[in-house]
Curated annotation (Swiss-Prot):
Changing residue 224 to E: Reduces affinity for FBXL3. Residues 563-586 have a biased composition (Polar residues). This is Cryptochrome-1. GO terms for molecular function: DNA-binding transcription factor binding; double-stranded DNA binding; E-box binding; histone deacetylase binding; kinase binding; nuclear receptor binding; nucleotide binding; phosphatase binding. Expressed in cones, amacrine cells, and retinal ganglion cells of the retina (at protein level). Expressed in all tissues examined including heart, brain, spleen, lung, liver, skeletal muscle, kidney and testis. Higher levels in brain, liver and testis. In the retina, highly expressed in the ganglion cell layer (GCL) and in the inner nuclear layer (INL). Evenly distributed in central and peripheral retina. In the brain, highly expressed in the suprachiasmatic nucleus (SCN). The gene is Cry1. Component of the circadian core oscillator, which includes the CRY proteins, CLOCK or NPAS2, BMAL1 or BMAL2, CSNK1D and/or CSNK1E, TIMELESS, and the PER proteins. Interacts directly with TIMELESS. Interacts directly with PER1 and PER2; interaction with PER2 inhibits its ubiquitination and vice versa. Interacts with PER3. Interacts with FBXL21. Interacts with FBXL3. Interacts with PPP5C (via TPR repeats). Interacts with CLOCK-BMAL1 independently of PER2 and DNA. Interacts with HDAC1, HDAC2 and SIN3B. A motif (LIR 7) lies at residues 335-339. Changing residue 485 to D/E: Strongly reduces FBXL3 binding. Reduces PER2 binding. Residues 3-132 form the Photolyase/cryptochrome alpha/beta domain. A motif (LIR 9) lies at residues 395-400. GO terms for biological process: circadian regulation of gene expression; circadian rhythm; entrainment of circadian clock by photoperiod; gluconeogenesis; glucose homeostasis; lipid storage; negative regulation of circadian rhythm; negative regulation of DNA-templated transcription.
């Protein structure tokens, strides 16, 4: 009997740097590449049409690339535990290969399939290629626990063995004499389904802003590396109105689905840096997005409750409000704040928003205005975001809601000033909220302040054609800051508000709240497309807020919180350079004292 092999695709939807597939082919007489799709899951899961379309395009591209090698992709309907025992017998399988899945659900699923394979006498090959590192080795190096600060994570990574080079791309030379048995009715039996077949209504569906697939991913990678301004100094470009739109060099959805190898990206960045900088060693900051991705994966890998508040040992238990009506307004872009509504509209239409836009809407939903649980926001992102990833999505929402990782709760994003600072003319608002197109720039971020005559000229009456603001931001955010202060005062490890809530950690970095050490960088994305990490990059300017109504060129409210004060008063904001956030680093103690010190005159909330 010959050696009949199967490679099971899940993530890792590519032929480049696919070590499990490459090893599976070696010594095999036949190879079949399968993707198992559960049609019932498509109709019942919390995944929107844009993500499904992206996945199906990835599968179509993978099938097209396999065709060039005289092979095909086998898309099989069903559940893995039901499908594999049948395939093992029907195809006389002797070898199965998979890419290692670090997430708890994936590990549980794969353990069950390995058991079935062993019982059937099938050899199982598992190789790591969705992450840069073996996460278990990082945890082992840290005394058996995941590192809970990024600084500790960086220390551990610096002690790891150098990364292996990406595996050779699967070509006809790699496949050699290994062939794929194909039948005439392959498309009927194993073809990639359409959205309609999965039960989606595609009427009115606009064309994809982010086309799925490995071919597109590699094209974007080359574009990304060719950008002259970025290549020249390896700094991210300045934030402007165009930054809010989908970029042809964005990579985050492709890393999420494994159309692009993180290892290939890593080494391409390294090679380019050495070429431009004349062989000098690249700093860790060059790999910002990739390393933060690894950090969240490491934090989540042994925590099946990572996406929950209850039962999650690293999450602060905050008594969030339950308000389905308010949640729906936020999710559907009906808050009455054009900046928030435009972001949520772009997300629903295109499946992607800039990481600073993610900051704004996450803060608004949770600690900023609505006081609704981060779990609800995470579910909406899971449905709509192309690059939503279980570990990174949950980690980002915990972080932005000040539930874990980072407790800078006295900074609050203004839903008026933040957008105005980024896009003063309001072009972004007009693009995604055409109902407001007629408003002049002066009022487009706060149209409720426009005189009735201007509203009539704009053909948009606030409260009739566009909703009034659902909350008073100045009042709501002040109340929520006070709530957060009281919650953190109750935490046993809390050390006061004078510093940026640096939660103490023990020698192996396992502080209970994943607090950052002073001077440590907060999560950042590289310029690769602003993926699910939602972080600031070093050197990036972040708008600051000036005053309670946030109506003039403002972005972040800075609250003073003297110990004797029950209600926190607003502090006049300074320029973005005045806060530690502008550099992506924690402020020093001196800077922080300036930003949030108690010596602040009380202001009216009117």
């Amino acid at each position: 009997m010959g050696v009949n092999a199967v490679h099971w695709f899940r993530k890792g939807l590519r032929l480049h740097d696919n070590p499990a597939l490459k090893e599976c082919i070696q010594g095999a007489d036949t190879i079949r590449c399968v993707y198992i799709l559960d049609p019932w899951f498509a109709g019942s899961s919390n995944v929107g049409i844009n993500r499904w379309r992206f996945l199906l395009q990835c599968l179509e591209d993978l099938d097209a690339n396999l065709r060039k090698l005289n092979s095909r992709l086998f898309v099989i309907r069903g559940q893995p535990a039901d499908v594999f025992p049948r395939l093992f017998k029907e195809w006389n399988i002797t070898k199965l290969s998979i890419e290692y899945d670090s997430e708890p659900f994936g590990k549980e699923r794969d353990a069950a399939i390995k058991k079935l394979a062993t019982e059937a006498g099938v050899e199982v090959i598992v190789r790591i290629s969705h992450t840069l590192y073996d996460l278990d080795k990082i945890i082992e190096l840290n005394g058996g626990q995941p590192p809970l600060t990024y600084k500790r994570f960086q220390t551990l990574v610096s002690k790891m063995e150098p990364l292996e080079m990406p595996a050779d791309t699967i070509t006809s030379d790699v496949i050699g004499k290994c062939m794929t048995p194909l039948s005439d009715d392959h498309d009927e039996k194993y073809g990639v389904p359409s959205l309609e077949e999965l039960g989606f209504d595609t009427d009115g569906l606009s064309s994809a802003v982010w086309p799925g697939g490995e071919t597109e991913a590699l094209t974007r990678l080359e574009r990304h590396l060719e950008r002259k301004a970025w290549v020249a100094n390896f700094e991210r470009p300045r934030m402007n109105a165009n930054s809010l739109l989908a970029s042809p060099t964005g990579l985050s959805p492709y890393l999420r689905f494994g159309c692009l190898s993180c290892r290939l990206f890593y080494f391409k960045l390294t090679d380019l840096y050495k070429k431009v900088k004349k062989n000098s060693s690249p700093p860790l900051s060059l790999y910002g997005q990739l390393l933060w991705r690894e950090f969240f994966y490491t934090a989540a890998t042994n925590n099946p409750r990572f996406d929950k508040m209850e039962g999650n040992p690293i999450c602060v238990q905050i008594p969030w409000d339950k308000n389905p009506e308010a949640l729906a307004k936020w999710a559907e872009g009906r808050t009455g704040f054009p900046w928030i509504d435009a972001i949520m509209t772009q997300l629903r239409q295109e499946g992607w928003i800039h990481h600073l836009a993610r900051h704004a809407v996450a803060c608004f939903l949770t600690r900023g205005d609505l006081w609704i649980s981060w779990e609800e926001g995470m579910k909406v992102f899971e449905e709509l975001l192309l690059d939503a990833d279980w570990s990174i999505n949950a980690g980002s929402w915990m972080w932005l809601s000040c539930s874990s990782f980072f407790q800078q709760f006295f900074h609050c994003y203004c839903p008026v000033g933040f957008g105005r600072r980024t896009d003063p003319n309001g072009d972004y608002i007009r693009r995604y909220l055409p109902v407001l197109r007629g408003f002049p720039a002066k009022y487009i971020y706060d149209p409720w302040n426009a005189p009735e005559g201007i509203q009539k000229v704009a053909k948009c009456l606030i409260g009739v054609n566009y909703p009034k603001p659902m909350v008073n931001h100045a009042e709501a955010s002040r109340l929520n800051i006070e709530r957060m202060k009281q919650i953190y005062q109750q935490l046993s490890r809390y050390r006061g508000l004078g510093l940026l809530a640096s939660v103490p950690s023990n020698s192996n970095g396992n502080g209970g709240l994943m607090g950052y050490a002073p001077g440590e960088n907060v999560p950042s994305c590289s310029s690769s497309g602003n993926g699910g990490l939602m972080g600031y990059a070093p050197g990036e300017n972040v708008p600051s807020c000036s005053g309670g109504n946030c109506s003039q060129g403002s972005g972040i409210l800075h609250y003073a919180h003297g110990d004797s004060q029950q209600t926190h008063s607003l502090k006049q904001g300074r320029s973005s350079a005045g806060t530690g956030l502008s550099s992506g680093k924690r402020p020093s103690q001196e800077e922080d004292a300036q930003s949030v010190g108690p010596k602040v005159q009380r202001q009216s909330s009117n």
